Swiss-Prot record:
Family, as annotated: Belongs to the RraA family.
Name by which UniProt lists this protein: Regulator of ribonuclease activity A
Organism: Mannheimia succiniciproducens (strain KCTC 0769BP / MBEL55E)
InterPro entries listed in its UniProt record: RraA (IPR010203), RraA/RraA-like (IPR005493), RraA/RraA-like_sf (IPR036704), RraA_gpbac (IPR014339)
GO molecular function (one): enzyme binding
Amino acid sequence: MRIDTSELCDVYLDQVDVVEPIFSSFGGVNEFFGKVTTIKCFENNGLIAEILEEQGEGRVLLVDGGGAVRRALIDAELAQLAADNGWEGIIVYGAVRQLSRLENINIGIHALAPIPVGADEDTQGESDIPVNFGGVTFFPEDYVYADLTGIILSQEPLELEELGEE
């Protein structure tokens, strides 16, 4: 289904939070949406791998990496795992790596920046907790919508059929 965050804001501005424009798109899919699953971790991605092993249909993983860009929390292997398990997208308040491979994987990925250094594989961190970045607090079970223009958050699912067709 087509996502246009600009049109969603035109219709639902009083019902959504708009994430600060600090993210870039790195995945093979530019538009995605789904129910939020959260992780908070710092420079390690073992917990991310555990969560991405789950079925992700209709879900978007939000990773609060503290805004650190010294180590990539998402690489091609994790992105492919997410795509294979049906995840709609991943939003990382941190870095990613292996960009030429990420852009060929059928999943949406938004992150702050690329860096070639990988994360530790420790499983330190927390999941299913509120996380705050980009001027917005994300709660598990919220709904997130992302495209090349931006990222918005809603407590309830938005009616996408109300958007105009191009």
